[in-house]
C-alpha cells in the first residue's frame, strides 16, 4: 500500500466520481485553528454552539463562579474557543442536508466515540455535536496524525488539506452493510460489516446478496476507481438496491473484518461457500457470522473509557467534571 492509494480514498477524491451512487454530502475545508482545537487534549470544553449568550455579564455570584475558577497560583477562564464563520458554514450545510448529518474527516468517522453522545449515536445537528465526537475519537486523531501508517513507500508525506465531510443522516440497518475487497480490479471477498452480530437473513440470502453486490461492482465500480486494489463499503436496502458508502485502502490500515490480510494479499483460502454453479462463475468469497454462538464483542468497546473519564470517575480532575456538566446542560438547552 502506497501513500497515493491512501490519498485516492479521501472522500473528496472519490465523491465527485460516484456522487449518484452514494448519500448526498457536503465537503467543507477545515480551518487550521479548528484542527488545532480538535487536537488539543487539554480541555473537554466543546465549542460550536450556535446560540450566543443572552448577556455578557453574569447575573449572580454563583454564575460568575461558574464561569471563572481560580486558586492561589493563577486564574483560568474555562471558555471554549469560538469559530463564528466556520460555525455558520457548518450549520448552513447541516440545514441543506435536512437538519441531521453523519460527520467524518477525509477518511474516518468517529465510530469509536458514539457512546459519548447524549443519544449514543453519530447523528449530529450542530457543530458542538460534531466537536464532541471528534475530540473523543481515536479514529479522528489517527486521520490527523498518522494518515499514512502502514504505507511502504519512503517518500515524504504529502501536505494534507483536511476537510469536514457532512453526510445526510440516514437510518442504516447494520445487518445490511457489507465490505468488499478488490484486488487487480477483481472482487475477491465480501464480508458482513457488523460481524459482531448474527443476522439470519444474511445466512439465508448470501448467494442473492453476493450476486447483487457483484452486479453493482461490475456496472458501477470496476475499472472506474483510481486504483486497481481497494476496499469499498456498500449498503443493500430492503428493496435490494445497493448504495455506495465509502472507499478504503487495500491494506492493514483497513479492518479486514471476517478475513485476514494474509488471506486477502495472498489470495489463499478465498473460495466462496456457495453452490458449484456459483463457484464456476468465479464468485468472491462471502463471509458472515453463521450463528449466535460466534457473536463477538463490539470492536469499539475498548474505546469507551478515555483518560478524561477515568479522571472524572475518580474525582482527580474537577475542571473536567465542571466542563462535562456544562456541556450536558448546554446540549439539553439546545434540544
Swiss-Prot record:
Pfam families: D123
GO BP field: eukaryotic translation initiation factor 2 complex assembly
Sites of Phosphoserine modification: 60
Entry binding sites for Mg(2+): 246, 248
Locations listed in the record: Cytoplasm
Keywords: ATP-binding, Chaperone, Cytoplasm, Magnesium, Metal-binding, Nucleotide-binding, Phosphoprotein
A molecular function (GO) term: protein folding chaperone
Post-translational modification: Phosphorylated.
Family note: Belongs to the CDC123 family.
UniProt name for this protein: Translation initiation factor eIF2 assembly protein
Origin species: Bos taurus (Bovine)
